[in-house]
Amino acid sequence: MTKIFKHLAKHWAACLVIIALLLVQAYGDLTLPDYTSKIVDTGIQQSGIADAVPEVVRDSTLQVLELLMTDADAAAVEAAYTQPGGTGNALSSATSLQKKLASPYTVRLLRADADRDTLAEVFSTPDIVLYLASAQAAGEGNAPDAAALDTVTAQFAAMTQMPGFSRDAVQAQLAAAIGQAGESELSGLSAQAVLLVGLEYQALGISDAVQMNYLIQTGGRMLGLTLLMVAAAVLVGLLASRVAAAIARDLRRGVFRRVVSFSASETDKFSTASLITRTTNDVQQIQMTCVILLRMVAYAPILGIGGIIHVAQAGSSLTWIIVLAVALLLALITVLMQFAMPKFRIMQKLVDRLNLVSREILTGIMPIRAFSREQHEEARFDAANTDLMRTQLFTNRVMAAMMPFMTLIMNGTSLLIVWFGGKQIDAGTMQVGSMIAFITYTMQIVMSFLMLTMVAVMLPRAGVAADRIDEVLTTEPAIHDPVPEAIPADLNQHHWNGEVAFHHVNFTYPGSSEDALHDIDFVAKPGQTTAIIGSTGCGKTSLLHLITRFYDVTGGSVTVDGVDVRQMPQSTLRGLLGYVPQKGVLFSGTIDSNLKFGGENITDADVRSAARIAQAEEFISAKPEGYESPIAQGGTNVSGGQKQRLSIARAIAKHPKIYLFDDSFSALDYKTDVALRRALKAETGDATVIIVAQRISTVLHANQILVLEDGRIVGKGTHAQLMESCPAYQEIARSQLSNKELDLKGGEA
């Protein structure tokens, strides 16, 4: 996993922006339940009245309320209100409500600079007393209304006119009543203060306006917050996708560059199918994981911690339900992961296996049909496919079983909250909106743990993919450029002739205990053709691979113009070579693009000259599009001979100093072979030509012929010399040519 985070660290700026946006999104998610609670509790149940402080109040009602306050509190209330059009700056909402009064009452408006929290404490007890008095005036079984409030205020006003009335006596009676009431009774009466404000608004004819104003304002804030959350979520998704895509791009680029630098031994170590899987499937797995890490792993802790803080601030006694839900969820995930995790590790290997079988079948479809092995290969593919299917079915079933259980836990959690929360609502210690908010916070906390556990399921598989990719990226190629100090100082100014020399070379393939080549010693001179012939598996191709540095020698040295190839940059060495592999390889594109594959400086004239020398001009001209004719992937839309001639033309167009032909003429008929070699001899001029061949006719006129047997040179010389001195060469020659063709007198060797 640390490998994935290292890749993310390269995009730290974008990650910081994503975290900032996630904080904005989490703020919205955590604030919306509060607004929902306010809409239910305040906007609906309390008719939009948030506290015990009326924003608009009649003079008559305010005077009665002040009677029930201390002198200091009454003075504070007087200072907090102003008359319409007075010198004080009234609250904007109070001014708006004053314009909607049903009758021209004499009212006071709450000042904009009033301390509402302090006023709420001051108004609380007088509001409760006045509401209870209004309820008593309404009569048993009747809800108090504006008329009852008017009756009570009139009674209080009349009482103040009675002889012997004392405000201090009223305060003393009120204090005694409060002292006799228990704390629970006072808590239960706290909501009555808001109801008194509702009666006052009802008397003023603005109760509906107050409620609608509150709902519109709160709903507007919720809408604005929701839009902000949506914008943040969209930006998070965009940035996370871009970061993940950039990481995937860099990984694919890194894997490609590393694979291109691999020698044949590293390619054999990983296998082509595995390298393809690592470059595609594994990189895609990491890309998906990076998106999830940025969108979920970073978001889940923010949401969970924020939900816990809100629940703690609410001081609810239902927090044990959250602990129970999280514990059950973690237990469920732990049990399921014990079954699923081993299968996730196996799945990647099975994907490699399926890719390998598919590649073998598709590349070998012709031999499969020729030998009627379709059923056998179908059985092979079916076995690999079935193994992968069974593993995927098992993991999918485990993951599918997770969702019903998690749904059960979440629904059970909601049920417990409603059950125990309902009892608290009945007791008056919780409001409906608060319970709704608590359910929402609980779901957010549970979902945050759920997101983390879901990511925990994916991370091991992504970790395996990251390890597989890292294995490729950290594998050092066996063939690498020399350090600058080891490169000859005059190499860049060196005039290359192309003389290739093997100095007592030994070579052993990686992992093998026996030499593939032993004590190879010869010189291939410019302007001459050196041919290498021998039985299958004697080391002919291996010898060419040492010149190209596909492998390095294990003993001795290979030099070009006296410079050890290991002391030359690979680009310099291969810039001197025109290599035609044993199996012609073409790339998707056109004939022209394939022939110009050897370098950027190849002109159209070079292409046409090379095609003419390689005897490819005739069939190219016969195509409607000529040199712009398309070539399918792997050259599947041309014949074997045409593919080989195009491969030869590609090497010729480069005008190299050294030509390497690895049994390149075997796919050609004799007539084309002779014509091609005749034209090639005129073209190569002073270049060094090294030909690996199976046919004697191909090497008959070479200046130097090397006969290989079991990795050793058993003969060296011209055709005539070898016919006299090398039994191995004589055996090959007699098996292919008649005595007349061998130009032997009397039919004898």
PLM regions: where:
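An intracellular "coupling" helix at the cytosolic face of ABC transporter transmembrane type-1 domains
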Residues: 10, 166, 264-265, 281-290, ...
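Helix-loop-helix
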Residues: 306, 310-327, 331-333, 337-338, ...
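Juxtamembrane helix-loop junctions of ABC transporter transmembrane domains
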Residues: 28-44, 216, 225-268, 272, ...
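Short intracellular "coupling" helices and adjacent cytoplasmic loop segments at the cytosolic face
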Residues: 44-51, 58-65, 153, 160-167, ...
